[in-house]
Amino acid sequence: MTQYVIIGDGISGSSAAETLREEDPESEITVITDEGEPLYNRILIKEHAKGKLPEAPISIHDEEWYDERDIDLSLNTFVTSVDTDAKVVNTHEGEEIPYDKLLVATGGTPTQLPVDNSDADGIHHFWTFQDARAIREHAEQANKGVIVGAGLLGIDFAAVCGAQGIEADYLMRGDRWWRYALSGKGAEIMHEGMREVGVEPV
């Protein structure tokens, strides 16, 4: 019996687990994620943070989906190391999970703000459903915000501020938003759109 371990429960990890179960019905499949819920639509979490969507439409799979397919789902589990010689995944709780085949499907993560107190209360990074919940909770009580980072996640933050009626300064390292991809004229169109919802590019 083959033991498969998948680190990451995004769309890649979840789809891999589903395909493995179809192709190898007798195998053992374990999916490990450091998040607190099963697969959800990451694109829609900004709509939740805006206050426009409840949680239900964002979820894609519930825990029952994994149970029905005999897939062992480990939530809130951090992988601390992988011993490729022994073929063992080690977790933060000291558990050793053996594997015959391992898939690392963790995806990317946003750059953390490289300053002291970047994890203080009221400072948010925007990537997970948990992040979106915290942003929504704080946004509903806030009057002023600051956005750091002139990329796609930053523009999502700007949209959240606009939807929640929060005036915000948008701090950008360069002279315009997404300077690597947009012309000056294109960026200015985006800047004007931000200003219309109360977000000022700086």
Predicted segment positions?
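Glycine-rich Rossmann-fold phosphate-binding loop(s) that bind the pyrophosphate
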Residues: 8-11, 127, 148-153
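FAD-binding core/adjacent interface of flavoenzyme oxidoreductases
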Residues: 1-5, 62-146
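Flexible, glycine-rich phosphate/dinucleotide-binding loops
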Residues: 13, 38-39, 88, 111-112, ...
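Beta1-alpha1 glycine-rich phosphate/pyrophosphate-binding loop at the start
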Residues: 2-72, 160-185
